[in-house]
Amino acid sequence: MLDAQQETYVEKISFILLNQPIAQCNASYNGLAHLKSQIRRFVNSQEKIKLLLPAFPCKTNNLDKVLSHTPDLGEYVVLRKFVQCIRDIESVYEPGVTFYIFSDYHTFSDYISVDLDHHYDYSDNLRKMVANMNCSDALKIVNFEHFDEFSDLKDTEYFDGLREKFGDPDYAENFTELKLKNNKMNQTYLGLKKFMNQDQKFVLAPLSYKDRRRRLADIAKGMMVQGKALDNFLQQKFADCIRLSIHEHPMIGKKYSLFLFHERQFKTPWHSTLLFDASRGEFIIDSKENHLKRSGVILPVTHDGKPWCYLQLSAADEVHAHALRQIRAELQHEKSGLYLECPVNRASLDMLLPKELSQLVKEFGSVLLRGFAPLADAEQLQTWYLNHRSAVTWAYEVNVQAFKGSTGEQPLHWELSCPPAYMAVHPHRYQYEDYTPHEYAVYSVASPDSNTWTVVDAALAVLTINGQEREQLRNTIMHYSNFSPEHGGNTLHPLVRYCSTSRQDVLRWQDFQHAQGYLTHLEGVSELTEQSRIYQRLNTLCHDPRVCFEYRLQTGDLLLVNNLTTLQASHTSSMHNEYWSIHLQPDSINSPWQPHNRIVEQAELTSA
């Protein structure tokens, strides 16, 4: 019998699983009750919650569907979704989770025509993605090689070994008869034939129509026979796990179906390609072939020298479309730090729509534009960038700020964390979302020497830490004071906050401990040793190369930054370096720069 606190754990864990990964297809009360009973058993013994998902075999050999044989943004997005679920469960249940992904490549290897080396390359890169999210201890990618039952076999023998050790001979021998008496089984068989006909079309192409039909029948039957053997193996070796599935099943307490992507369809990254539609600000999951048929300009994006995803941009006419197609697109990290480089002709920035660029900034944290025609002056930057949007107004009604040499240097921070006193951003009137710019632009006017901008993926930084630590940081408040004569101001910020725009937790920290004109201290943390420990932890977290990277700005570069999901620092080695910056006003009706609020502020100043 669980006590009240333990029952609360059960309810919270159930909610997280149902709200995030589990699809709840044809859900029944018994399915929910069984899920809770499984969770209750783990909680009662203070064990880790155990989840099992057979999936992630390898990329299909069909290059009409995918970019290559290695994992790409599709796999990363799904794994990041799993890590988010793990962190959320950790935050409410201290023992945490072990999430097993059992690669089923060897189960079906004789039917999918994918090289063994490609499978290992795929799995190794998946593990690298998980390691970059610091979650290898909780999200484990395993295979037959990790079990004693297969220790006497070579990896090329796992396929036959599975059937021999865990198969159902009666099921295989009586397959045709069983199929004719079981409609669900027959539907699965027909569905597999149809799917594999399309998936293996290049392998099947040399065969005659009759031989192709015979081969598809063998493949469908063989995959179902192997699937039965895999089920038997998993039931023995992972009997205590909550069983997840990439296929649709009624939620009756046996297998819990997952939507791998946010789209509520049963799609997998190893059979599809991701495209980011900049006009809509969302990912489209489809085949590579279909993406390339879309309207607009389709740009391939690489990461670490590998094909990664596509971008779709709009073009005003065919001249602009031709110029846009020359752009080289590359991501610094798996899902952050986008380079768009125009290699020839110094094309005008006018061919890029600022609103589409803002969607890219929102999704990828920062975008660097390089190789485009230079801007003549600050007014041209303002006109192009704003595009009927409004800018933050600084002292003397300035929208574009100019910095030269060391005046542009800043430690790790986010913009307007501690607004100047002249902005009259009073905490009783304005919330964080009201006055924090969601985006800003930096134009490198002159950069004869190194002009470095460090960008921290503040959402990924939070994702790399245990859920318990995340909540401790959320409940830790940092007090920032700016006592410089031209600024002034005081603010309070939690070290972790939920960003409603990106729907994720982000780190909010500024390394102003030794910055001139600033004082910082942690609210409610009186011990200097504890304050020092927290500062050191934050410093280590933010400078982890898995979450931060550098842009080395050249003359003419334009850097667009998501101020809500990143932290930024700038450093220059020359007094001759110069840049301009302009910040978009927050999308809040209660922004301090809204006309009705400026009228109130003017009235208050007059009465004072």
Positions of PLM-derived features:
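Short loop/turn segments at strand-loop or loop-helix junctions that form parts
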Residues: 45-64, 100-109, 141-149, 443-445, ...
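Non-heme Fe(II) oxygenase catalytic core, chiefly the N-lobe of the double-stranded beta-helix
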Residues: 300-551, 565-591, 596-608
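Histidine-anchored nucleotide/phosphate-binding helix
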Residues: 74-94, 354-357
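A substrate-binding/cap region within the structured catalytic cores of diverse enzymes
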Residues: 105-265
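N-terminal regions that are enriched for targeting/export leaders
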Residues: 2-79
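Hydrophobic beta-strand segments of well-ordered beta-sheets in folded domains
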Residues: 47-53, 92-105, 139, 232, ...
